[in-house]
Amino acid sequence: MADVAKVAVESPLPHLDRLFDFSIPEALDADALPGCRVRVRFHGRLVNGWIIERGPTEFDGALQPLQRVSGPPVLTDEVLGLCRRVADRYAGTFTDVLRFAVPSRVAAVEGRPPQPPASTPAATDMGVWAPYGLPDQGVSTWICHPHDDPFDMLARAAVDTVARGGGAVLVVPDARDVRRLHAAVSALCDPELVAVVSAEASNRVRYRTHLQILDGSRRIVIGTRSAVFAPVTDLALIAVWDDGDDVLVEPQTPGWHAREVAALRAWQVRARLIVGGYTRTAATAQWLVDGTAADVRLSREAARERRYRVDALVEPDADRRRIPARAFAVVRSGLEQGPVLVQVPRAGAATGLICAQCSHPIRCSRCGGGVRPDRAGRPRCRLCHELAHACASCGAHDFVGVGAGSRRSAEELQKAFPAVAIIRSDADSGVLDTIDARPAIVVATPGSEPRVPGGYAALLVLDTDVLLARSALRAREEAARRWMAAVAVTSDEATTMLVAPQDLPVVQALVRNDLASLAEMDRQERAQAHMPPAFRCVRLRGTSSAVSEWLAAYSGEVLGPLETTDGSEALLLSPRDRASGMLHDVQRIQADRSKAGRPPVEVRVDPVDLGEG
């Protein structure tokens, strides 16, 4: 019996997430290979699909023939298997994931002869990793010292991997990071070995780059989140930098996180995985508890020798002001040496609540989630929707909103330092990549800090309560990540001043240079609340009737449903060791509802914005 093509049809409908058999016309037989795009007639319409395999069919009727084969194979078996695992991990469909793994076809760039292979680099000096004790294999969760260069370190790991005969994929959050990492790698090896995968590139460039990676001429891939799917030959190293940045989460269905995809892929091909940042996430702290990752950070001796100075202060209640006198002193002293960085949160309405008595962020007494005013102005948890009645720290009942912006900060600082240049770097005024080393005050929002040769002479972090009072499960983790990113652009001798209560765990972690303990504290608190990463969580969103109908078909642990401004929301929870059953049930219910034509319910697994509203 002649082979048939088993095709995954591109469709958003969950009940069509399976393979369909199509006959192969003789004229297409030589071209109809696994990994090829095809056009097929499906339910009376011409649609796109992918040949996943060829083989015999169990169907005894007449099959629809393939209509067209669109180009050469561009989907490898390894990436195909990865897409299936990611779909199952995020309760999505195979083709929903596949669209991120392979760029759209541009026929004009096909058929070009492969480039001659670039010269294999010599083994590079890995001495920068020596104080960290990086293992030669397995999974590593890495806390980088803020005054080390993580891009040089990752570049060296990648080039060393290629020198040993392997390939490498390096994933970073944004285009600025891509440029820095590309420069670091290109300084160590032939740039022709390197491919850049970025959403900023045109589709023509992205498709040409994909073909170059496929033919093996590009051994190191650098890019933003979708680069994690790049079909690198002999993949031996995957690295994800700054995994706490939520831009590593794909906003479209099914909402995968590049860190989790990297972990699935590293397990699948037995590649080494390095996940790092200036801080550690609760997710990778969970890997340490599970025994699946190595703890990579400076040795105790090296950390003692290279302490970075972080201080915290809060003015006495009677003299409380937004920029305390001691903070002005830090700025004044820093200006004698060079530019000073002032980090402020983005402007806007109140993003959370703090205690009017002691300034501690208000958090839910039931689940630990952030609290913010609801539509009626009542202090309500955005995670479990309980009302908050008292500050957990001092018992006071009066709460105040928090919120501030870079423009107001710049105006205050200009009044205090009229002879000093004030530079803003933010989304409103424009983000600067670099400035020179002349004395100036740079007011920047998180992620917009320009770099300066030699680093800033001082750092002042204002309005810390805004980040800490965010109504998100990850508020403390995110605050530490943003503040440490600012510390990383200071000089070795700089002082960092946080205007924040000194007894807050996140502040103490920075003061003590101990980000590992903070990550473990976050992990433990979330485990007690049955929240990720110790538990898998699925968030359902839809109309009230659709969510209620969906839940009627489900028998596991549920929080909710609760009414929201847009309809209804519920959370499904499961211990991780039983999560595969929950996710399978979610896929089954979604498929059943799709087949029956029921109203859609949005599904998100382990959403990073849990608790926000």
Residue spans for each PLM region:
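Accessory, non-ATPase domains that flank or precede helicase/AAA+ motor cores in DNA-metabolism machines
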Residues: 1-309, 333-336, 358, 450, ...
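C-terminal helicase module of SF1/SF2 nucleic-acid helicases/translocases
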Residues: 34-37, 280, 325, 329-333, ...
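Short hinge/gating elements
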Residues: 62-72, 313, 392-399, 463-470, ...
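Conserved phosphate/pyrophosphate-binding and hydrolysis machinery centered on Walker-type P-loop NTPases
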Residues: 72-76, 147-151, 171-175, 252-255, ...
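Conserved RecA-like helicase motor-core motifs
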Residues: 189-201, 365-366, 374, 418-428, ...
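C-terminal boundary of histidine-terminating zinc-finger modules
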Residues: 307-331
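Cys/His-rich short segments
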Residues: 322, 327, 332-416
